[in-house]
């Protein structure tokens, strides 16, 4: 068994939860990496499940600049959908693939500190790295943490955190390599073609042109932040593409490389 001291942080989007085959393929890839000594930390969203639960309760989904607005009355439903249902669906898929996993949220183990991000967004949190002890213990056992993006302030108030930003903070905390996996193969140009590599200036230009917008804008800016902080490229790739997952397992570059 080879050992790899770096942590691979895989952020998966909520759309994965609705694709059983995609989940199985990703977990099989993660299981192979863990068996080869690679430490893997998974961070997830669950936007589609949140939308479904809110609609079932007669509540509206509102977004501002790609971020979910979270009024206090929606927080229990959002926490249940993310830290509950979404987390356990992924944990079930991990168990099926033979992975020993630990379902958790950002509030566990004093892992991050959190505060309100912007009053206009309601109970949406900004999080900061705090203590890696809990995560490092789980990883040292050969287990895979599966972390939802629910955080908590010092007064116990739950906060909803954008999952891309949550993954960024955890990657910083454990000094890991970040891969943002979604249902698209990477960042696409105006013609729908994959862009293999982007730097900060190119990202700013594409945002200005409206090519990168909404959720992808949040994702790419989070990737750029961690790339600059860690001085290494962050990958934006797809869990749908089996060839990308195989390449990922081999440690090869996949999708779009966000350069520091």
From Swiss-Prot:
Substrate binds at residues 46-47, 68, 160. GO terms for molecular function: acetylglutamate kinase activity; ATP binding. One of its GO terms (biological process) is L-arginine biosynthetic process. Pathway: Amino-acid biosynthesis; L-arginine biosynthesis; N(2)-acetyl-L-ornithine from L-glutamate: step 2/4. InterPro entries: AceGlu_kinase-like_sf (IPR036393), AcgluKinase_fam (IPR004662), ArgB (IPR037528), Asp/Glu/Uridylate_kinase (IPR001048). Its main location: cytoplasm. It is an enzyme of class 2 (transferase). The record marks 11, 219 as: Transition state stabilizer. It is found in: Cytoplasm. It catalyses: N-acetyl-L-glutamate + ATP = N-acetyl-L-glutamyl 5-phosphate + ADP. Gene3D superfamilies: Acetylglutamate kinase-like. The keyword Cytoplasm applies. Keywords: Amino-acid biosynthesis, Arginine biosynthesis, ATP-binding, Cytoplasm, Kinase, Nucleotide-binding, Transferase. Signal peptide: none annotated. GO terms for cellular component: cytoplasm. Its EC number is 2.7.2.8. SUPFAM superfamilies: Carbamate kinase-like. Belongs to the acetylglutamate kinase family. ArgB subfamily. Catalyzes the ATP-dependent phosphorylation of N-acetyl-L-glutamate. NCBIfam families: argB. This is Acetylglutamate kinase. It comes from Shewanella oneidensis (strain ATCC 700550 / JCM 31522 / CIP 106686 / LMG 19005 / NCIMB 14063 / MR-1). The lineage of its organism: Bacteria, Pseudomonadati, Pseudomonadota, Gammaproteobacteria, Alteromonadales. The gene is argB.
């Amino acid at each position: 068994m080879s050992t790899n001291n770096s942590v691979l942080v895989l952020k998966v989007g909520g759309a994965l939860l609705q694709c059983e085959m995609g989940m199985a393929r990703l977990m099989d890839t993660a299981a192979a990496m863990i068996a080869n000594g690679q430490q893997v930390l998974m961070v997830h969203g669950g936007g589609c499940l949140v939308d479904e639960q809110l609609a079932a309760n007669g509540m509206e989904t509102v977004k501002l600049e790609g971020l979910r607005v979270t009024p206090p009355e929606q927080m229990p439903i959002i926490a249940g959908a993310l830290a509950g249902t979404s987390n356990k669906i992924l944990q079930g898929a991990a168990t099926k693939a033979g992975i020993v996993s630990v379902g958790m949220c950002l509030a566990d183990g004093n892992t991050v500190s959190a505060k309100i991000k912007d009053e206009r967004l309601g109970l949406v949190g900004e999080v900061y790295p705090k203590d890696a002890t809990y995560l490092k213990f789980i990883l040292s056992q050969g287990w895979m943490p599966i972390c939802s993006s629910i955080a908590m302030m010092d007064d116990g108030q739950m906060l909803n955190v954008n999952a891309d930003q949550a993954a960024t903070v955890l990657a910083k905390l454990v000094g890991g390599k970040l891969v943002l996996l979604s249902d698209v193969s990477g960042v696409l140009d105006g013609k729908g073609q994959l862009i293999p590599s982007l730097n900060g200036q190119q990202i700013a230009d594409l945002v200005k042109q409206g090519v990168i917008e909404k959720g992808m804008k949040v994702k790419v800016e989070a990737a750029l932040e961690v790339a600059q902080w860690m001085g290494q490229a962050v990958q934006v790739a797809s869990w749908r593409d089996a060839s990308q997952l195989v390449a990922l397992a081999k440690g090869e570059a996949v999708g779009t490389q966000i350069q520091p």
